[in-house]
UniProtKB/Swiss-Prot annotation:
Residues 16-37, 53-72, 85-104, 130-167 are annotated as: Disordered. Pfam families: Rota_NS26. The modification Phosphoserine is found at residues 67, 154, 156, 164, 166. Plays an essential role in the viral genome replication. Participates, together with NSP2, in the formation of viral factories (viroplasms), which are large inclusions in the host cytoplasm where replication intermediates are assembled and viral RNA replication takes place. Orchestrates the recruitment of viroplasmic proteins such as capsid proteins to these factories. Participates in the selective exclusion of host proteins from stress granules (SG) and P bodies (PB). Also participates in the sequestration of these remodeled organelles in viral factories. It comes from Rotavirus A (strain RVA/Cow/United States/WC3/1981/G6P7[5]). Residues 16-30 have a biased composition (Low complexity). O-glycosylated. Its main location: host cell. This is Non-structural protein 5. GO terms for biological process: viral genome replication. Keywords: Glycoprotein, Host cytoplasm, Magnesium, Metal-binding, Nucleotide-binding, Phosphoprotein, RNA-binding. Homodimer. Interacts with VP1. Interacts with VP2. Interacts with NSP2; this interaction leads to up-regulation of NSP5 hyperphosphorylation and formation of virus factories. Interacts with NSP6. Participates in the selective exclusion of host proteins from stress granules (SG) and P bodies (PB). Also participates in the sequestration of these remodeled organelles in viral factories. Mg(2+) binds at residue 92.
Amino acid sequence: MSLSIDVTSLPSISSSIYKNESSSTTSTLSGKSIGRSEQYISPDAEAFSKYMLSKSPEDIGPSDSASNDPLTSFSIRSNAVKTNADAGVSMDSSTQSRPSSNVGCDQVDFSFNKGIKMNANLDSSISISTISKKEKSKSDHKSRKHYPKIEAESDSDDYVLDDSDSDDGKCKNCKYKRKYFALRMRMKQVAMQLIEDL
């Protein structure tokens, strides 16, 4: 069985920064250059009074007072830029339209007109081949020597070895037979004692 993996192309990530992709005009602090869907309202006290008096008390909700200071809330909402997804990201705050207290107003000018392109490709192939080599296994099987299995009663004195225990059959009833059995019995007892101790 063989396993081969061929990876032709590792994942490659290429990043490129491109400019001027946004279709909207870049925002400036002066508020002169704005997108097509942006709107501004002059946040003065007179306009705020007209706005609040034009609504009935039942129609005034949480969106009309986003903070504890109504004038600050109106200034925050009027300075917010309305834009769509195609116009990019732009936030403008004009210095001329700030209230005299400067409470709750932060001057922000932010434009995002950069992007990152990523490309990742992975091409790989895996091939598995299972070829059984039967001829080699047969030759290995023939070259092995087959030894007899040890019988359960092989430690007894009346157990007689036959010619298959040796290569040329010369160990049948030899003088070392009883010494061999005695040694094997002692080794077996030592092994059993070690197993019990563990």
